Amino acid sequence: MELASGARYVSLPCLEAVMVRGRLTMNAAQRALFEAVGRSGKLIFSTGGDTISANLVGVFTVRRHGKEDRLDVDDGTHHVHVKWRRVARAEIGTSGGEGLLTFWNGNDLLFELFRPAGSFPAEVEALVGELMAPS
């Protein structure tokens, strides 16, 4: 959908991606976690529900793009715009032998990152938990 400002808005059940002017920046806890995630090798980003799902595969890096912190896949051709204020908590585990990071806003599942090579490194595990200071 195109907004009056000319920006594009995409809404999926579990993740809102908004490409507009404004600050979409990470806090220190989120930045530390995603920098460690970026050193974890090739990952699979997964979001969606019963109706629509999307997967992106590659090495994920947070890069500043204008006034936002964007989650880039490999060279950034494919990327994810994130409302970081909604990424409140991360949980770590495994699923089918793959490492699994699950990102939440309250009880709402936002997205998951799978690591086909196995469990995430201890560096990542040490940084999961609450990512937002209580309001």
Tell me the role of every PLM-derived stretch.
Residues 1-135:
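Eukaryotic intrinsically disordered, low-complexity regulatory linkers and tails enriched in Ser/Thr/Pro
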